[in-house]
């Protein structure tokens, strides 16, 4: 049922995007795409691949800090499949759990420890997101003169993301809060396991063990110097490379645009992709990118051409790479991804 919903949402998203492109003018868009410089497009693809590799390096720092043993190659495949799964699920919600599951399976470690590494890896993105959001929102107010309500909406979304991460992190390192979480889960469990004291006792023991393993893994990573002094700066490098990739696509079309505007579009696209409507923000993100670039002075058909090519690299290439890893994980994994 879930995979049918995702397929329907993808079809709706692509249909809306198609209508948008028809309105702009397909012939003009195709003509602009034909003029793109292959050298700069190759550079954009190379930067994207480098970004994925550095993402794996950053995650590996958390994995090593949690004392989980695995090699680079399977870790890269797991990362790419997780990112591809995010691109086909609303609010990018499926990839993290899949990454934790696969890491747990192939490293033969508890799922709780694997999930903790994914939490830290995602959390490291919060810091460049905050910095770029502050710069971008001020620039949006001054240059684009967006309505106050739109800016407030973006600020609320950003605050919700940051607040949620730090709350989860705080709960993750405080043993007493872990006990409260366990009590809350047990209260719900007692509704479904009335008059089954043995099952409740086993469940309580498993939950306690899971929370302890998870919190131990988080504390190990936070105390590790490499997480702070290597992985955190690497997060800023990864975001910088994202901007360079988009910039390279603009160069391919002979267009110069301020990197601040690119950063703004990235931030808005990131926040929009977190809204649980369309898979990976498909359709909505493309529309916003075309709108922003045209407002920055890029002709509408050219904005559409640049957006299509950029999304082919950042969105669809990632999905293709993720699908290409499925044979490595076995036929059973195909069902798990598309459930």
Curated annotation (Swiss-Prot):
Give the chief site where it resides: membrane
Bilayer-crossing regions: 6-26, 37-57, 124-144, 148-168, 227-247, 248-268, 287-309, 312-332
Q: Where in the cell is it found?
A: Cell membrane
The protein's name: UPF0104 membrane protein Mfer_0536
Q: How does it sit in the membrane?
A: Multi-pass membrane protein
Keywords for this protein? Cell membrane, Membrane, Transmembrane, Transmembrane helix
**PANTHER family xrefs:** UPF0104 MEMBRANE PROTEIN MJ1595 (PTHR39087:SF2)
| Any Pfam family the entry gives | LPG_synthase_TM
Would you say which domain of life the source belongs to? Archaea
Cleaved signal peptide residues: none
């Amino acid at each position: 049922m879930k995979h049918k919903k995702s397929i329907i949402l993808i079809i709706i998203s692509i249909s809306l995007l198609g209508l948008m492109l028809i309105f702009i003018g397909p012939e003009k868009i195709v003509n602009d795409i034909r003029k793109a410089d292959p050298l700069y497009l190759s550079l954009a693809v190379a930067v994207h691949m480098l970004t994925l590799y550095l993402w794996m390096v950053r995650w590996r720092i958390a994995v090593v800090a949690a004392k989980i043993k695995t090699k680079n190659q399977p870790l890269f495949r797991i990362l790419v499949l997780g990112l591809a799964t995010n691109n086909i699920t609303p609010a990018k919600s499926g990839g993290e759990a899949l990454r934790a599951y696969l890491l747990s399976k192939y490293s033969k470690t508890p799922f709780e420890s694997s999930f903790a590494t994914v939490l830290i890896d995602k959390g490291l993105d919060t810091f460049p997101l905050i910095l770029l959001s502050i710069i971008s929102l001020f620039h949006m107010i001054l240059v684009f003169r967006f309505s106050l309500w739109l800016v407030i909406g973006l600020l609320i979304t950003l605050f919700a993301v940051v607040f949620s991460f730090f709350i989860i992190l705080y709960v993750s390192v405080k043993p007493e809060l872990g006990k409260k979480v366990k009590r809350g889960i047990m209260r719900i469990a007692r509704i479904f396991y009335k008059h089954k004291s043995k099952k409740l006792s086993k469940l309580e023991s498993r939950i306690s063990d899971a929370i302890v393993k998870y919190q131990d893994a988080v504390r190990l990573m936070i105390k590790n110097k490499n997480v702070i002094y290597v992985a955190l700066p690497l997060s800023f490098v990864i975001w910088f490379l994202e901007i360079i990739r988009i910039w390279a696509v603009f160069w391919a079309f002979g267009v110069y645009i301020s990197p601040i505007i690119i950063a703004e579009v990235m931030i808005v696209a990131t926040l929009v992709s977190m809204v649980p409507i369309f898979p990976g923000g498909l359709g909505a993100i493309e529309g916003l990118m075309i709108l922003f670039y045209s407002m920055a002075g890029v002709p509408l058909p050219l904005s559409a051409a640049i957006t299509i090519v950029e999304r082919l690299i950042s969105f669809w290439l990632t999905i293709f790479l993720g699908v290409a890893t499925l044979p490595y994980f076995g036929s059973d994994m195909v069902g798990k991804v598309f459930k």
